[in-house]
Amino acid sequence: MDDIEDSLDQWKFAQCFGDKGDVEDITEADIISAVEFDHTGDYLATGDKGGRVVLFERNHSKKGCEYKFFTEFQSHEPEFDYLKSLEIEEKINKIRWCKRTNRAHFLLSTNDKTIKLWKLYEKNLKVVAENNLSDSFHSPMQGPLTTPSQLRLPRLNHHDMIIAAYPRRVYANAHAYHINSISVNSDAETYISADDLRINLWNLSISDHSFNIVDIKPENMEELTEVITSAEFHPINCNHLMYSSSKGNIKLLDLRQSALCDNPCKLFEDQEDQDSKSFFSEIISSISDVKFSQNGRYILSRDYLTLKIWDVNMEKAPVKTIPLHDVLRSKLCDLYENDCIFDKFECTFSGDDKHVLSGSYSNNFGIYPTDSSLPGDRGQIVLQADKAAFRARKSAANNVPKLNAVKNNDWRSQPQAAMGSASVGLDPDNLDYNKKILHASWHPFEDSVAIAATNNLFVFSKL
C-alpha cells in the first residue's frame, strides 16, 4: 500500500489553457464539451460549445508533459431544421481520432445531427516573388520592354507554412435524434454513431448512406422505457461493440449474429436492492458513459453516483464498484430541482488499465485503482482542476505546500493545497455545482490526463 500512496503523491499540475477570468465572465461558446488524445499521445483535441475544434501538439523540447497550440478550426455552425422548427446547436458532442496512415491527421467530430471527417495537414503558402509589374523591375517611366533580358517571368517563393483543415467527408441526415456517441472501429475503415434510439454503422469513405444496426424505437412512443446513452467499439475485435442505456444496463453486440443487432450476446446489469428504491433510483442508475479497457477485457461504466468495472466474461455483477457521490444522496431532491442530477459525467481507463478516472463537482476529479482486491475507497486520489494551480505554479519557489491527496476516502481531513490539486471536502452544502468535470482523457502511454474545466483545459501528469 505504501507504493500506491507514493505513486499518488507524484501527480502534479502541468499546464492550463484558456481564459483565466472569473466564471461569471465566461462566454457560453467557450465552454469545452469534448477532449480526446490521439493514439500516440502527441496530439490533443478539444471541442467547445461554439463548434470550434482546437488541437495541441506535444512540446518535445520541454521536460515533462507539456503541449503547445497546433491549430484551430470551425467544425460546425448553428443550423435550423425548418421541418421540425428546431435549432441545431453547433456544440461539439464528441471527437474521435482516426489512426494516422500518412503525414496528415484525420479526426471525426459531431454535433447533434452531423458528423464530419476532418483532414489536417501542413500546407506551404507561396507568393509571387517577381514579375515585370514589380516596382523594382519596371515602371511606366522606363518605357516599353525592348529586349528579352528585360522580361521577368513570375516566380513563386515559399512564404509560410500553415496547418490546413478541411472536411473530407460530411455524414448528414442519418439521425432523427441527438447524436451522443461516435466510435472508430479497430479495422480503421468503419465507425458507429449513436443517438437516443438508434446506432448506425458507417464506412469512413462513404458519406451518403449507413447501416442501421440497433433500433430500440417502439412503434408507439408512449411505450418508450429507455434510451441509448453511450456506445463504443471493442478496441481489438472489430465485430464487437457495446452500448449503455438509461436503464443502467450495458449490452454487448456481435455484428456477425445478424444485420440488426436487436438481441445482445451479453447483458451486464447490476440488480438494485428493491428495498432501497426511490423516485430517483432510475435517474441515478442511468449510465452516462461506457469505455472498454485498452485490452478489451474490462468495461468501465459511470452513473451519477458510482463507477463500475465489469469483466466481459461476468455479466451478473461488476467486479468492482467505486462510490463517488454517496454524500449527495441526501441532496437528490435539490439536485433534481436544479437539473444537476442529469449531468453526464464521462469516464476513462488509464493507458495501462491500472487506474480509472472520472469527474465530480467543484472541479474535482478522481483517480482510482482498478485492482478488485482493493476496496472501492482504497488507494484513490482526488485532484482539483482550478485556476489556483496557476497562482501556485508562479509562486512555486516560495515554499508551496506539497500536493495533498485523498487516500482511504478521508475526504474532510485534508486541507486544500496551493498547487490547485488538493482534496476539497465533499460537503454537499459547500460544493460548487456550477463547476464540474464532465470531460477528460487519459494519455495512451503515460500517466498524464487532460481535464476540461468549463472553458479551461488542464493537464496533470506524473512526469
UniProtKB/Swiss-Prot annotation:
Residues with PTM Phosphoserine: 134
Gene Ontology molecular function terms on file: protein phosphatase activator activity
WD repeats: 27-66, 87-128, 174-212, 223-263, 282-320, 337-378
GO cellular component entries: cytosol; mitotic spindle; mitotic spindle pole body; protein phosphatase type 2A complex
One GO biological process term: negative regulation of septation initiation signaling
Annotated keywords: Phosphoprotein, Repeat, WD repeat
Keyword Phosphoprotein annotated: yes
SMART domains named in the record: WD40 (SM00320)
Entry similarity comment: Belongs to the phosphatase 2A regulatory subunit B family.
PANTHER family: PROTEIN PHOSPHATASE PP2A REGULATORY SUBUNIT B (PTHR11871)
Subunit and partners: PP2A exists in several trimeric forms, all of which consist of a core composed of a catalytic subunit associated with a 65 kDa (PR65) (Subunit A) and a 55 kDa (PR55) (Subunit B) regulatory subunit.
Protein purpose: Phosphatase 2A affects a variety of biological processes in the cell such as transcription, cell cycle progression and cellular morphogenesis, and provides an initial identification of critical substrates for this phosphatase. The regulatory subunit may direct the catalytic subunit to distinct, albeit overlapping, subsets of substrates.
Full protein name: Protein phosphatase PP2A regulatory subunit B
Species for this entry: Schizosaccharomyces pombe (strain 972 / ATCC 24843) (Fission yeast)
Gene name for this UniProt entry: pab1
